[in-house]
Regions:
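Domain-level signature for soluble enzymes in the chorismate/prephenate branch of the shikimate pathway
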Residues: 1-275
């Protein structure tokens, strides 16, 4: 099968992709941005698309969430891969003084405390992925550049790690979603099963959010996450992203929500695999 992922090779998404779909059995195809990864599936260029959705330090990856809610149709999360994230600061061998650090905005934010303490004057430059940052630094060996990226990137692009595990906390994890129309057969042991719904509440009704969430409580369904995101229509209008740990039939849940006037978009029902 063809698997689209946020590249280039040796990115964290690449690690999640190879954990679920070993490279000796599947064709892994890198794309430069999250949007391009998802669109590659929509254009039938790949069989599954893998994108980051949430980090334990920095929260949701809004580019993923917003695209799936606002633009994607007939595309659902079919599996979730949870990957431990260790951020490394790397450069070419001949760099003695670093003036600019490149990385994905999430990686920069996860490592900001270290940077502020040890390199307060350095300039920070966002890139589309951590691996692309490492690749760019390797392509400019005579520039005073460094990248924040995984260990695999230092190996892939011939860089030297100058500071190890610079993320703010040790327990740093990222959730990756496997997007598609069918559930993949993965040679992994599932940790649990979840559903993700996007709820749009009826306008200007007092207690609308409370009533919607009460439906989950009434059916004994445990929520693991709730987050508001702007509808990008008018100021103050939101949809609510809800994750619930649940493995049973949930059609009755959808019916109960819709009776309250809640518009429900199903983003996925999937097994969770923790690496």
């Amino acid at each position: 099968m063809r698997i689209g992922f946020l590249g280039p090779k040796a990115s964290f998404t690449y690690a999640a992709a190879t954990a679920a779909f070993p490279e000796d059995q599947h064709e892994l195809i890198p794309f430069e941005t999250i949007t391009e990864v998802i669109r590659s599936y929509e254009r039938d260029l790949v069989d599954f698309a893998i994108v980051p959705v949430e980090n334990s330090i920095e929260g949701s990856v809004h580019q993923t969430i917003d695209y799936l809610f606002l633009q994607a149709d007939n595309l659902h999360t079919q599996a979730e891969i949870i990957l431990p994230i260790r951020q490394q600061l790397m450069a070419t061998d001949n760099q003695k003084k670093i003036e600019k650090i490149f990385s994905h905005p999430q990686a920069i934010a996860q490592s900001l405390k270290y940077i502020q303490e040890h390199m307060p004057d350095v300039k920070l430059e966002p890139t589309d992925s951590t691996a692309y940052a490492a690749q760019f630094v390797a392509q400019h060996p005579n520039k005073p550049f460094a990248a924040i990226a995984p260990v695999a990137s230092s190996i892939e692009y011939g860089l030297t790690i100058i500071a190890h595990d610079i993320q703010e906390i040790h327990e740093n994890y990222t959730r990756f979603w496997v997007l598609g129309k069918t559930r993949p057969q993965l040679n992994l042991v599932a940790d649990t099963q979840k559903i993700t719904l996007a709820l749009t509440l009826p306008d200007n009704l007092p207690g609308a959010l409370y009533k919607a969430l009460k439906v989950f409580a009434d059916f004994g369904i445990n929520l693991s996450k709730i987050e508001s995101r702007p509808l990008k229509t008018f100021l103050g209008e939101y949809f609510f992203l809800v994750d619930a740990v649940y493995s049973g039939d949930y059609l009755y849940l959808l019916n109960a929500l819709e009776k309250l006037g809640v518009t429900v978009k199903q983003l996925g029902r999937y097994k969770v695999y923790k690496m």
